[in-house]
Design a protein with these regions (language model features):
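Short, well-ordered beta-strand segments in beta-rich or mixed alpha/beta enzyme
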Residues: 2-9, 36-65
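A general marker of short, structured functional hotspots
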Residues: 4, 9, 16, 31, ...
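Compositionally biased, low-structure terminal segments
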Residues: 21, 63-64, 83
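Short amphipathic alpha-helical segments
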Residues: 12-35, 67-70
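Glycine-rich beta-strand-turn "strand-cap" elements at beta-sheet edges
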Residues: 2, 30-48, 70-93
Length: 93
């Protein structure tokens, strides 16, 4: 499985979340299979978006696209960090 981990600060979580939810169709078409949203325990505006992806190449194209850059601006995202990951092992304890 392939994943993308995005860490970013947002101006306002509720405003960001509304735009995130509106983008569900373009996220799906870019290969997002599932996601988790997390936040720092001491700052609700520091968000971690962890998603399973069908293709890291498609994910890179999507996250670097002018359309998504504009969406991030509207959502109040500040300097996102993208980490592209390949699963090497999974287990349940």
């Amino acid at each position: 499985m392939q994943y993308v981990l995005i860490i970013h600060e947002v101006e306002s979580y509720p405003a960001w979340k509304a735009i995130f939810d509106q983008a569900v169709d373009i996220r799906k078409s870019a290969g997002e299979i599932s996601y988790q949203l997390l936040r720092y325990d001491n700052d609700a505006n520091n968000i971690v978006h962890f998603s399973a992806r069908s293709s890291l190449d498609n994910a890179r194209r999507f996250f670097e696209s002018p359309e998504l850059v504009e969406i991030r601006k509207k959502a109040g995202v500040k300097a996102p960090d993208f980490i592209y990951l390949q699963e090497i092992e999974r287990d349940v304890l």
